[in-house]
Amino acid sequence: MKQKFKRAILYARQHRANQEVNESLHRLVDFLSTQDIEIFQDSDTAASFELKTPVLPREKMGEKHDLIIVVGGDGSLLSASRMAIKVNTPVIGINRGRLGFLTDILPQDIESHLGPVLNGQYNEEERFLLHTKIYDKENSYFEGDALNDVVLGRGSETHLIEFDVYINQQLVSHYRSDGMILSTPTGSTAYALSAGGPIMHPQLNAIVLVPMFSHSLSSRPLVIDGEAEIELYISKSNETDLRISCDGHESRVVKPGQKVAVKKNGNRLRLLHPLDYHYYDTLRSKLGWESKHQG
């Protein structure tokens, strides 16, 4: 049996401040109160929901046997992951979103699935994040992390943008396209998939680069070593500023002539699942794959 948990930290985003999320949060509080668990909420949760539980400062998280319980969709868990890796605290999700690739537990299964997890009966995965930096010769302008993907986009530019991709200081190619998606295996079922990228098992140590509407028909998704260091050199021929976003959340300007460095973050997300979780079951149900021969 694995680590049992002594404290639960409830996390929900303001973006998800609706009746369904509120109902699940209160149901969690009622259930956790019967489990000999100290109950706290994150500051983001307290700003949007009226729970009668104390706020645990983020610098205090991870000091005991803590578990972050996310209520919402995959976007909420992506947001929580950037906090969780800094305090080495595991995360599990209650799905109140749409697809729910990362949030395993259905609202009606809170008691039956979360109870065993609290008592040390769960599967734990480590998922890596990408660390991103925008810089030039003089300054560093932005640093951010992404569990799913880092996306270079056109911003306000109406034409194809131009940039060079280097991997481990070796030129890969010059691109003219709408942008580039750099995805982890976790993010391979998100934006990268819609752009034609491959589905990668989450335990692969790999990164996929997916060009967006490239001008070249030979420009295809490229799967590379997860330990590689990637640099995007933004061409000075671009007429306006471009944008870099991390998980579609943190978006920053990147100017012509600047560089974007992307590599694996040294810290990993500890993502928990109930014991009956299976990755291929999730793929089949979320993507609508057939479960048996129909002949």
Curated annotation (Swiss-Prot):
Reaction catalysis annotation: NAD(+) + ATP = ADP + NADP(+) + H(+)
Gene Ontology biological process terms in this record: NAD metabolic process; NADP biosynthetic process
SUPFAM superfamilies: NAD kinase/diacylglycerol kinase-like (SSF111331)
Residues annotated as catalytic: 74
Cofactor(s) the protein requires to work: a divalent metal cation
Binding site for NAD(+): 74-75, 148-149, 159, 176, 178, 189-194
One GO CC term, this protein: cytoplasm
InterPro entries per UniProt: ATP-NAD_kinase_N (IPR017438), ATP-NAD_kinase_PpnK-typ_C (IPR017437), NAD/diacylglycerol_kinase_sf (IPR016064), NADK (IPR002504)
Keywords, in A-Z order: ATP-binding, Cytoplasm, Kinase, NAD, NADP, Nucleotide-binding, Transferase
Pfam families the record matches: NAD_kinase, NAD_kinase_C
Compartments (UniProt record): Cytoplasm
GO molecular function (one): NAD+ kinase activity
EC number: 2.7.1.23
Uppermost EC category: transferase
Role according to the record: Involved in the regulation of the intracellular balance of NAD and NADP, and is a key enzyme in the biosynthesis of NADP. Catalyzes specifically the phosphorylation on 2'-hydroxyl of the adenosine moiety of NAD to yield NADP.
NCBIfam families: PRK01231.1
Family from the record: Belongs to the NAD kinase family.
Name the record gives this protein: NAD kinase
Organism from which the protein derives: Legionella pneumophila (strain Corby)
Lineage: Bacteria, Pseudomonadati, Pseudomonadota, Gammaproteobacteria, Legionellales
